[in-house]
A protein has these predicted regions:
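Short amphipathic beta-strand segments in non-cytosolic proteins
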Residues: 25-42
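Residue-level signal for short segments within beta-strands and strand-turn junctions
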Residues: 16, 28-32, 79
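Structural beta-strand segments of beta-rich domains
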Residues: 8-10
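Feature of secretome-associated and extracellular-like proteins
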Residues: 2-4, 35, 63-131
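Glycine-centered loop-to-beta-strand initiation motif
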Residues: 39-59
């Protein structure tokens, strides 16, 4: 059975008007359409506004059969009583770093409006710049 990367590792920083946001809650969620599996994990930013989340992987014999991989990915930031969409993306492969074809490094500025940014196969929507 091959390793299937549903969500690559993520690193990032969160700021508001250039000031690091310490103690922000970062929640990552996924929906793997092939198995209708959902999952989530959470971390909190440090004093410098930094956070990291490890990759999420699975193994499956079913993945050896022809199908279109689709994993809905979201990252939400909760800070100061407000929720921000940091990352909304539909991953269409099981590759490590397959979202951007490079490691996911986010620079999230809470004072900005969420916008779409080009990614490997589609757009990533959110308040974070892709490093």
């Amino acid at each position: 059975m091959a390793k299937l990367v549903l969500f690559s590792a993520v690193e990032g920083t969160i700021t508001r008007n250039g000031t690091p946001v310490a103690g922000a809650k970062v929640t990552r969620e996924f929906l793997w359409s092939m198995k209708r599996e959902t999952g989530s994990d959470t971390t909190v930013t440090d004093a410098a506004g930094r956070f990291s989340l490890p990759e999420i992987t699975r193994r499956s014999l079913m993945a050896m059969f022809p199908h279109e991989p689709v994993v809905r990915q979201t990252i939400t930031i909760a800070a100061g009583g407000t929720s921000y969409k940091a990352w909304v993306y539909f991953k269409r492969n099981y590759d490590d770093n397959g979202e951007l074809r490079r490691p996911i490094r986010l620079s999230c500025r809470l004072e900005t409006e969420p916008v779409g940014r080009p990614a490997s196969y589609d757009e990533v929507f959110g308040v974070c710049d892709l490093g």
